[in-house]
Amino acid sequence: MKYSIIVPVFNRPDEVDELLESLLSQEEKDFEVIIVEDGSQIPCKEVCDKYADRLDLHYYNKDNSGPGQSRNYGAERAKGEYLLILDSDVVLPKGYIRAVSEELKREPADAFGGPDCAHDSFTDTQKAISYSMTSFFTTGGIRGGKKKLDKFYPR
């Protein structure tokens, strides 16, 4: 398996539904999805069950420990060669997995990231929030690739 898509979730079943729907539209299917429910009072298990026969989907429910620990929990259970860590509110565009694969063939990498963008279906309010969270003017260019911080040195 090439990719393990790890998604920590806290009280966001509607977002998970949209994310899983966007994963169905991917042409490249060499991935598993690991949903880590982080102590939610509004679980997304029923949403995950809807997709269980169409995606290689693994659902885990654990006590609340925050998104970082939940990402690690998912990573410990992942089988993929690469880990793609997404937030529950992500909607992937069609062709995303294929584009990642092509870029990794062209330029192998141990880690990568990218800018956020507002989906066409977003309301004006959602677009404004997205802009305030990702704009060069509000983040100083740290997000979106405008400013290179430094070389990464693993410990």
Question: What annotation goes with each model-predicted range?
Answer:
Residues 20-61:
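Acidic donor-binding segment of Leloir-type glycosyltransferases
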Residues 62-78, 99:
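Glycine-rich, basic loop-to-helix element that forms the pyrophosphate-binding segment
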Residues 1-25:
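N-proximal low-complexity "stem/linker" segments adjacent to membrane-targeting elements
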Residues 87-91:
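The conserved acidic donor/metal-binding loop of glycosyltransferases
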Residues 83:
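Short aromatic/hydrophobic "clamp" motif used to bind/position activated sugar donors
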Residues 95-127, 131:
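Conserved donor NDP-sugar-binding/catalytic core segment of glycosyltransferases
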Residues 9-17, 37, 41, 93-94:
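A structural helix-start
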Residues 114-120, 129-154:
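Short, flexible, basic/aromatic active-site loop/helix in glycosyltransferases
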